Structure formats: structure tokens, C-alpha cells
UniProtKB/Swiss-Prot annotation:
GO terms for cellular component: ribonuclease P complex. This is Ribonuclease P protein component. It comes from Caldanaerobacter subterraneus subsp. tengcongensis (strain DSM 15242 / JCM 11007 / NBRC 100824 / MB4) (Thermoanaerobacter tengcongensis). It catalyses: Endonucleolytic cleavage of RNA, removing 5'-extranucleotides from tRNA precursor. It is an enzyme of class 3 (hydrolase). Its EC number is 3.1.26.5. NCBIfam families: rnpA (TIGR00188).
């Protein structure tokens, strides 16, 4: 069964993950994560104006969301995750971003390899 993936939207939800969560990072992304007590993973995406104009920022958010959606079946459920984009992310393609997110997730307790 496919797990549901919802988005973090409220400022209060983001602040809770920033202040209470743990962090892993690489050159494209800083990832904050913490348990949420629910049966689903929730993801939020923060892309500042330093990354580019709105078209670029929205594209980055779409790529991050799709990458996380594809990897969600390999994750333990019940976590809030916030991805914060770093400067060079606008130059990265989809496959690079997906690999980058997967490497970050493997450093956390969220990731569990499942057989297909």
C-alpha cells in the first residue's frame, strides 16, 4: 500500500521542526526532521529568494517534493521533514536532487531499505 504524503504549510509547523528537530545537510539541501506522532510523513519546503525568481523557486520546490514522494515508500512513517534549499540547488537536475535527498535520508533513522 502506498503511504500518504502531506505537506507542512503553517509557520508554526515549520518552527516546531526547526527548533526541536535534528539536522543533516549537503551542498544542495539542509534537512530538518523529527517524529510527528502521526501515521504519515509530512514534508515542507523552504526556498529563499536568494535561489532565484519565483519560477525557479517553484521548480525547485516541485523537484524536491517529487523526489521525496518517490523515496517515501522506503521511509518509516510518522516524521515531519523540512527541506531548506541552498544556493547551488537551482543548477541541479532532478536525478542529482533525488540522489542528494536519498543520501541525506540514509543518514537518518527515517530510511529503511525495503525489498521491491
Amino acid at each position: 500500500m502506498r503511504e500518504k504524503l502531506t505537506k507542512l504549510k503553517k509557520t508554526q509547523e515549520f518552527k516546531r521542526v526547526y527548533s526541536n528537530g535534528k539536522t543533516v545537510a549537503n551542498r544542495f539541501i539542509v534537512m530538518y526532521y523529527m517524529p510527528n506522532g502521526l501515521q504519515v510523513n509530512r514534508a515542507g519546503y523552504s526556498v529563499s529568494k536568494k535561489i532565484g525568481k519565483s519560477v525557479v523557486r517553484n521548480r525547485v520546490k516541485r523537484l524536491l517534493h517529487e523526489s521525496f514522494r518517490l523515496l517515501n515508500s522506503n521511509l518509516r512513517q510518522g516524521y515531519d521533514v523540512v527541506f531548506v534549499a541552498r544556493g547551488k540547488i537551482a543548477e541541479a537536475d532532478f536525478h542529482t536532487l533525488k540522489e542528494s535527498i536519498e543520501k541525506l535520508l540514509k543518514k537518518t533513522p527515517l530510511y529503511e531499505e525495503k525489498e521491491r
